[in-house]
UniProtKB/Swiss-Prot annotation:
It comes from Geobacillus thermodenitrificans (strain NG80-2). Coiled coil: none annotated. InterPro entries: aa-tRNA-synth_I_CS (IPR001412), Arg-tRNA-ligase (IPR001278), Arg-tRNA-synth_N (IPR005148), Arg-tRNA-synth_N_sf (IPR036695), ArgRS_core (IPR035684), DALR_anticod-bd (IPR008909), Rossmann-like_a/b/a_fold (IPR014729), tRNAsynth_Ia_anticodon-bd (IPR009080). It catalyses: tRNA(Arg) + L-arginine + ATP = L-arginyl-tRNA(Arg) + AMP + diphosphate. SMART domains: Arg_tRNA_synt_N, DALR_1. GO terms for cellular component: cytoplasm. The lineage of its organism: Bacteria, Bacillati, Bacillota, Bacilli, Bacillales. Monomer. This is Arginine--tRNA ligase. One of its GO terms (biological process) is arginyl-tRNA aminoacylation. Disulfide bonds: none annotated. Keywords: Aminoacyl-tRNA synthetase, ATP-binding, Cytoplasm, Ligase, Nucleotide-binding, Protein biosynthesis. SUPFAM superfamilies: Anticodon-binding domain of a subclass of class I aminoacyl-tRNA synthetases, Arginyl-tRNA synthetase (ArgRS), N-terminal 'additional' domain, Nucleotidylyl transferase.
Amino acid sequence: MNIVGQMKEQLKEEIRQAVGKAGLVAAEELPEVLLEVPREKAHGDYSTNIAMQLARIAKKPPRAIAEAIVEKFDAERVSVARIEVAGPGFINFYMDNRYLTAVVPAILQAGQAYGESNVGKGEKVQVEFVSANPTGNLHLGHARGAAVGDSLSNILAKAGFDVTREYYINDAGKQIYNLAKSVEARYFQALGTDMPLPEDGYYGDDIVEIGKKLADEYGDRFVHVDEEERLAFFREYGLRYELDKIKNDLAAFRVPFDVWYSETSLYESGKIDEALSTLRERGYIYEQDGATWFRSTAFGDDKDRVLIKQDGTYTYLLPDIAYHQDKLRRGFTKLINVWGADHHGYIPRMKAAIAALGYDPEALEVEIIQMVNLYQNGERVKMSKRTGKAVTMRELMEEVGVDAVRYFFAMRSGDTHLDFDMDLAVAQSNENPVYYVQYAHARVSSILRQAKEHQLSYEGDVDLHHLVETEKEIELLKALGDFPDVVAEAALKRMPHRVTAYAFDLASALHSFYNAEKVLDLDQIEKTKARLALVKAVQITLQNALALIGVSAPEQM
């Protein structure tokens, strides 16, 4: 149950009722009532500017309108202790904080379900993310996209959306031919035969490893077979090796997928031809200079796009169009693609394609993931010390731990550049945000263990009104009560970093409370029981928040 959210809605409704009772405007003229938390505590718990909004319609000074609303406002119905009119016409509400005590039993009863809502109303949403070519290791951009995509998927599901997490396997096209040719070269080299890598080949250590494995497993068997047969086998072998590695890395990073969708299946099922036929029937295909073009300018793209080149090969765009048509045919009403910053220019043509297929282009949303810069000892890390090549996702996980990587990558909007301080990420100090948040969970877990040793329990008949006696307790209760609204907002605005910020704020409120108040006081058993219920609610809420961003909640540190 969302106690704070319900109270806010009741407060808004009472404001609407007061406007009506004061005869200021007709109900249909009343704008949305907005509540804000004032920056300064002296200005109350909530404030509204409704009087300023109504001034033009009611043809009265905002302050006079505010005073009329206050006169008709029934404070007792909504736990308001005091109301003030401030400045040009702000109405400030000072709450009777006893209503906040209901937050604690609501959390204890809900447990892992605390924070859930139905703002998504079961809407079918597909989140497609990572989708790295199966031709090498996952790099830092993939890792950040994985963290953002998975956190967003978790948050959407928590908010009542029907979420499918999908990885698009680019297992067709020239890059896969180059993979097969690269494996072939490394295979022959492993057998002692000199064969150069193709011009656009893959030079990673993983390709060397595949070549060695093939040589160990099959000896010179593939030296004597037809090249086409050899490359077909190497293609499948290389793909399976690379994809298994990607799957293992993502599993270690706590990122699950519901669907692994093969690009090759689009060719085999005829879905590419279907998409092309749909565009042709709708009048958005034409032939020019021996190529087949998509008239994307009809939908605001800056130029038309080639789908089939003069040599008969497909551009990347055509299978992508077929893939998005298939997504929409599967019943998803919202397609959220998590793409690297280099794909920014691709968005208008994909939206144009969706519109040309007869769907709402707004069904497609793209979350852009910007670059990650690693820093260690105050200097930028450009290459791995171990391999001399770009740092991989696996290396970063091993260096600083999954929790730190997941937290840091979910700490900022994906569309902002991120400087990742590796020294800070492993520091056991309050300057390290993931340590600070996890330590809050370990701290409340320790308190609950100590209580058990003293045979003290938060269960049973506990007077929770003890929890509104100090400012630190009230701040903690307010923070706990905000969680469902934070999750709902993070889902609707596609902002997983809001949950990360919330976890930090809740941890801060807990540490502040702990430093100011004595939780286990054997001379005040009733107050102690109430505070134990409070810290148990903090434990549950921290666990739930951290779970959404893929970070563990340790009981000891």
